Structure formats: structure tokens, C-alpha cells
């Protein structure tokens, strides 16, 4: 496997896309500092998954996107693609070329791609694991990486050995196993807590279960006795009901005769009322017409007022138009005057322009004459200068010798200056070293302060860690409490759902009908399922309905017959059916409003029930004669006021039956309430949802606390690392101080050498000046001979200068004339535009004047029309007044006729009232019989309610434990004895039996889970031990191999010496660090921190190549690691790379010629434009592309 190609788009300083082909074993990247060479190395590191922006020399990940320059806009994304040749299938992919890509947007979010398909960073890391490649492996050695490897802590250096040993995947597996072990321990602790809590509940719950069994036995015996007593009463009441119903039929016949007479009188009354209605309608029409005509007259009067206001408005507008016309005429006069003024100014400007043009032409002629004289003088000057040049031949030799001496003196002076400059520079360097020494000592003090600050922060983090751990423990407890509550509510909800699905609490006959409803037709459902009741009235309605909650509502009597036949055929028990087409509601009729005024009266029971409209008659039938009150006191007061056949139920479930019997007391809380069951299910669902939300919040809080704790732990580790880094920085400052002292000594010796050079140069300069003086005297005598000719030349030159000055002055005057002409022309153009604008405005004013005159004429015409309309409206007003007077007379006549008809109707109404009184008397007699019937029915209903609600028995179905009671007194005494025995038991948890059984099952289940978790813990612990043994073995094997190769490589690079690796904790191979000890040729064995920079760099290189031999990487990237080496070591290192390029591919960023010489392909990076890198390539056999 080797690197084939690298593509960059918008990455760092590369604004344009570039492609680098790696066709040679050794590829070099060269270029000046700051040109962007290292950005190519950063691109490879980045595409392999680097997550630290700081490592990529940025503050955030979006900094890798090209930020723009003077000529290039900033980009909004960057991408890098790396092509790997995989023909030898080192990577576990069935392709010959593997393409790894990474893209980033301005938000800093990265996407990874493998062969063009999006993937995770972990997928790429897993692919490259143990191949020697990756963002943190030794295959990429960046700027300063050599020193960082050597100066790494022993624990950090160990990571390179782990990569070489191939134990990264084992380390990852171990971490996963430890997480699973931690989770298992956590689950184990939670299970043990639950078992401990449940075991505490077993003893008390077992006693409660035994007590509940005894309670059930006594309760069953009491039920048999009470049911038989109630059934005997129910049979006797049925016999009395039959007698009362016969008396009721006789009264019904008499009521029918009175009703017919009343109907006849009512028909006569209705006929008269219809006649009266016709007359009243006629009266209403007359009144409507009367008021309409009055309204028209008022409307005509209003219109007259409006017309008057309009006429006044038009008059005002006419006056305003007159004023506008006057203003327009004034403006026209102003504009005419301005136009005359503009004409005068235009004439003046024309005269000025003509004068300037004449002056311009005369100046131009003068300029041409001066130019001609100037050319003639320059030609004479040229001939004089040539004559002097011809006479200078004799002076050339002397001048040449003089110049040589002069040049030599200049060189000596420059040498003296250079020596002075060098001395000043060295003195400055010496002062800078002193200053740098002071800064280093200041830095040392600053580092010490930072270390103390970091240690203080570390102490605060430890306290925060303890606080978070305590809060986390409390959050876990709260989470467990909420989860337990949720489990309890879910269990209760499940029980209610099971009861609902199994029809628990319904009579046998009702159950069989509901189960067979798919076979039968017309079944709507039981009463309990078809109504909705507010929780406040739930107990009252359940008490009022009793067993009738299980009555089955059907569409019609045919459906009822079908259901009864089905029960008979299947012997499925009995049920009561309510056909919608036959059931008629009965409702209490309050003629006496005193009942409503009773404090505590709430209303008729049926009004507190919601149902479908078509079922309301059924609800009226069931509850229309039942009143609901707040308590028993108000119920008794209502019963006293209204002694008729109705039932009163309180909100507490107490009942006053129609006969006056009062039923009340405590309710059986364990009784199966059919009406409230659905509501309880909905309430429980809401509670479960609330608990689930609360559990989610607790879980979220728990996760937040765990994340905060992890964050604090991470911060602690960062602070610890910072302290270690600061200690290293402090040590480096100490080393720099030692180096500074050495450099200062060298500079002092150099200053002494420079002072000796300075004295020698001064002596040589004195001799040179003496020789130069002799030649200078000789030159002076020759120069006197040419002085006359020079004077003549100077005169000519002055004449030329005067003419040139005069030429320039006249030229300036011409330029000023041009400017003045341009300004005058501009003013003339401005006046012409103003003249044009004023003429245009005059035209517009004329048009406006015409418009105002036209509007004035229209106003005069409109005023005339208003005067005509006023005359018409006055005529209409007189006509309407006559019609109104006639309508008033017709109204009076019709009102008299209506009054007569009303008197006849009053007489008939008295007759009808008398018949109604007699009818009501007979109805009262019938009502008394109905009351007696109702009382007996209510007594039987109460008996049925008690049987159905308290004992789940229907009289129609019979009773399996029916007995004949001969001694009612003895039976009553037995009931009291049984009730006392039940009372002595006290509070009984009737669900204790089921709860005890559930608790035992739950404990068994948790114990099995506990055993499974113990086995899992043992298994995971064993896996971790096996992984650790494998890691120790692989690490030890890799360490021995690298140690041997490191010593060999060190000897090859240093031409001798020795080096070795040592373990800081040999007995702990899983965590031991690694230290490096080296001995260059001719020196003692010592630690790397005491070696020179070049020795440390070469030692680091030896270590890298030792790793290469033990676990070769397919390619290596070296970023200026040869910088600290001298030429000899660079040559040796370059040959070494050349040798190993047979086994691996190298990409080298370098400045060194010796290293470039070994490369077959060289890429140059330049920055011709600021901030934009450009790539060029060259091969040994090719020109630069």
C-alpha cells in the first residue's frame, strides 16, 4: 500500500484546487518560509481525522477554510481527498484504490467519506488501526514533533509503542468491557436495593393476607343472610303493587272525559285568537305605512338641509378659485421679468468669451517664437560641450589613477564602517542577550505563578467533583423512586384494563350478551358505557342507578326480544334491556319552587349526565325522577317539602327513597364501581404520562450531572497536563539561560577580534590618502586651462534656462485662459437651461389658469341645479303631509275592532280555566295512587340496588343460596353478630392476598436477575483479565524489538555510540512509561535533555526509524525535521532515507539542498500573491511546469 494522490480544495492558503501525485518513493516539498508548505502536511493530518484546531495551527476548525485575500473572495467550505493504493489488500476493503475524504463548512461541522460514501470518523480510525497510519502515529512527524517526542513524558511516549505493538484495538475492547462491568455493577447494586426493600414488605403483607381471607369468609356468610331477607321483602311489595294499579285504571277513564270537554273549548278559543291575529296584522301594516311616509317627509327635509350646506361650500370654493387665478397671474409676471434678465446676461457672457479667445490666439503665437530661439541656443551649447570632451584625453590617465586611489579609500572606509557596524551589531546582540536573560527570568517567575494558579484550580475542581458525586447519588435515588412509582401505576392500570377486557363486575347475563354482541343486532351497550359524569357527581349517579348501570340499551324491542331469546337458548342468565323506541322518560315536575330554594339542592340527576341526544329519553327514564343534593341534611329538608314519588341521592352516596326510607353510611371502597372504572383508567394514564415525563426529566438531570462530573474530571486531567507542560516549560527556560551565558562569552571574544581589525584598516587608509593628494594637485593645474570654456558653457546654459522658464510661464497662461473659457461656457449653458425651465413653467401656468376657469364655470352651474332641486323637494313635502293625516284616521278605526275581539277571547279563557281546575283535581287523585305505586317501586328498586350493588345479585335471576326464613328476629340478631365480628377485624386490605402473591413472584424474578448479573460480572472480569494479559504480552514483545532496532539505528546515524529504552515500571507492563537513554560516540551515557539540539533531533529520528523497522508504515511524512541538523548529518540522514525508500514512501518538507538531492520529485510552494499559495512541480528530467 502506498500514497497515490492528494487533492485540496479551499484548504487554508490554497484558494484554487490542487492535486499532488506521489509517483516517486521520495517526494520533497520546498519553498520559502510562510509560503504554505506545511499546509499540505496539515491537510493529510486533517483528512486522517485530526480533531484539534490547535494542532492544525488554528483557533477553530473553520479556520482551515480559505479566508480570502486582496484578489480572491473567502470560500465557505474546504475539502481534502487522499488516495491510497490498496492492491496488496492491507486495508480490509475489496478495492484497489481507497479514497478517504473530509469536508468542512463554516459552522465547523465535518463530514467524512470513504470511497465517496459518507461515514463516521470511527469507521476511518478502525480502517487504519494498527497499520501505522493515523493522525497521532509516528508516520507523520511535523514541525517541532521531534522535540515533542523526545521531551514527552514516559507515559505519553508509551502510546507510540502501543501503536507499534498493535494493541490499540485491545485497549479499545478493554475500555468497552470496563464500561460494561461498571454498568453491571450499577445494575447489581440497583437489584440488591430493590430486593432489600421488597424483603422488608414480605412479613407485614403475609399477615394482612391472612386477615383478608378471614374477612372474605365472614363477609360471604353475612351476604347470604342479608340477601335472603331482602328477597322476602321484594316479593311482598310486588303483591301490593298489583292492587294499586287497578285503582289507577278507573281514574284514567274519568280523566279522559274531562279532557275531551276541555279540548272543545280550547278549539273555540283558538279560532277567535286567529281572527284577532288577522286584525292585529292589519293594524301593524297601517302603522308601518304611516311611519314610512313620516320617514320620507323627514328624509326630504334632511335633503333640503344638505343641499343648503352644499351651496354654501360651492360659494366658498368659488372665492378660493378667484384667489388662485390672481396668484397665477402674479407668478407669470415674475417669470417674464426673470427671462428678460437672463437674456441680458447671456449677451454679456458672449462678449467675455470672444475677448478670451483673442487673447488665447496671441499667446500661442508668442510661444512658438520662444520655442524657435530655445532650440537654437541648445544646439550652440551642444557644440561647446563636444570641444571640452575632445580636450579631456590628457586628463583620463591621471583621473583613472586618482579614481583607483579614491575607490581603494572608499573600500577601506566601508570596511571600517562594516567593522563598526559589526561591532555595534554584536554589542546590540550582547545587550539583547542581557535583555532576553531578564525576560527569561521574568518568564520563569510567570510560569511559577501559573503553576500555583493551576494547582489552586485543581483544588477547586476536586471540591466540585465531591459535590457533583453527592448530587449524582441523590439524583439516582430520586430516579429510582420515580421509576418505582411508575411501575406501581402501570401495574394498577394493567389490572383495570384486564377487568375492563374480562367484563369483571358485570352480571352473568350481561357478560354473555356483550361477548355475543357480534352475533346479535341492535345492541348499543350497557348504560355505564354510554354516559359521562363529572367526578363530583360520580358517586351520586352510581348510587342512583345501582344495578341499572348494567342495563343494556338496544335500538328497539325486536333487538331486546332477540337478546332474551339468546339468553334462554344458551342458559346464559338474565339481563334487563332498554329499547330506545319504547322507553319514555319520567321527570320530576316542580310546581312548588320551594324545593329549588333549599340550601344544598343541586338538580335532577339526569341533568348531570352527558350522552348522545337519542339516548336522553332512556336517561330520563332512569334518572328523571331522582334529585341530587349536597348532603343528607339538605336531602331530608327536600323530602319534607315534596312528599311524592321520587328519590333523593346525596353526593356522599346517601339515599332517601320515595317512601321515605333513608339508606346511608360508609361505602365499601373495594366495591367494583363500573361508572368510575373508565375514569380511573384515564386518570391513571395521565398519572403514568406525568410520571414518564418526570422520569425523563430525572433521567435528563442524571445524565447532565454525569456529564458535568465527566467534564470536571476532564478539566482535572487537562489541568494536570497543563501543570506537567508548565514544568517542562520551566525546565526549558533553565536550559535557555545556560545557553545564553555561553553565547555571551562567545560574543565577548568576537568583540576583541573586531577591535584589532579596526586598527589595521586605519593605518592602510592613511597611506592611501597621501598618494591621492599628489594626483589631486596635478589635476588642479590641468583644470585651470579649461575654466574659460566652462564659463562660456555656463552662460549658454543660463540663456537656455531663461528661455525654458519663459516658455513654461506662457504655457501656464494659455492653460489658465482655457480654464476661464470653460467656466464662462459652463455659466452660459446654466443660464440657457434656466431660460428653458422658466419658459416651460409659463406654459404650465397658462394651462392651470384654463383649468381654474373651467372649474369656476362648473361651480356656477352646480349652484343653479341645487336651486331647482330645492323647489321639487318642497312640493314632495306638502304631498306627504296629506297622506300621513289620512293614515292616522284609518289607524284609529282598526284599533277599536281589535279591542272588541280581545274582550270575547277573555270570556272563553275563563271557561277553559274552570275545566282545567276540575281536570287537575282528578289528576291529583291519580297522582296519589301513583305515589303509592312509586313508593313500593322505590322500595323494590332500593332492594334491587342493594342486591345488585352490594351483593351482585338480581332478584329475576334467583339466588343459589336461597333459604326460607321463619324467624326474622333471630335472622336480624345473626346479621348484627356477623357485622360485629367483621368490625373487630378493623381496617382490612382486601388486595393483600394478590399483593402478597405478586410480591413473592417479584422477589423470585429479581433474585434470578441478581444471579444472572453475578454471572455476567464474573464473565466480564475474566474477559478484561485475558485482554490485559494479551496487551502485556504484545507490549513487551514490541518493546524488546523496538529497543534492539533503536540501538542499531542510532549507531548507523551517529557512526557509533549506543542507545537504549528503559521502562519506568517494569513490573506494571500495562501502565509503565518509556524513557530514552543515549550515548553519542566519544561521550558519556546521559539523558536526552542534556544533549544538544542536533543530537536530540538525530536520536528522535533513530527512534522513528526503529518503529519503522518493527512495524513499517506504508508512507512517512517528515516536516522540516532536518532543520536542527548540520550539513554532514543531513547528508547522512538523506542517504539513510534513500536506503529505506525501498520499503516505504516518503513525503519530506525541507529547506536543505542535501535532502532535495535525494528526491526524485520536487514540489515547490510559492506565494506570489499575499495569502494565496501556488504549487509547481519538477522532476530531475523535466523543466518546471
Curated annotation (Swiss-Prot):
Keyword Chloroplast among UniProt keywords: no
Keywords from the named record: ATP-binding, Coiled coil, Cytoplasm, DNA-binding, Nucleotide-binding
InterPro entries, alphabetized: P-loop_NTPase (IPR027417), RecF/RecN/SMC_N (IPR003395), SMC (IPR024704), SMC_hinge (IPR010935), SMC_hinge_sf (IPR036277), SMC_prok (IPR011890)
CDD domains listed in its UniProt record: ABC_SMC_barmotin
Coiled-coil stretches: 167-494, 677-1031
Residue span, SMC hinge domain: 521-639
Keyword Cytoplasm included in the entry's annotation: yes
Compartments in which it is found: Cytoplasm
Residues that hold ATP according to the record: 32-39
Gene Ontology process terms (BP): chromosome condensation; chromosome segregation; DNA replication; sister chromatid cohesion
Transmembrane portions of the chain: none
GO cellular component, one term: cytoplasm
GO molecular-function term, one example from the UniProt record: DNA binding
Organism domain of life: Bacteria
UniProt subunit comment: Homodimer.
Matches recorded under NCBIfam families: SMC_prok_B
Family, as annotated: Belongs to the SMC family.
HAMAP family in UniProt: Smc_prok
UniProt function note: Required for chromosome condensation and partitioning.
UniProt free text on domains: Contains large globular domains required for ATP hydrolysis at each terminus and a third globular domain forming a flexible SMC hinge near the middle of the molecule. These domains are separated by coiled-coil structures.
Protein name in the entry: Chromosome partition protein Smc
Species annotation: Halothermothrix orenii (strain H 168 / OCM 544 / DSM 9562)
Gene of this entry: smc
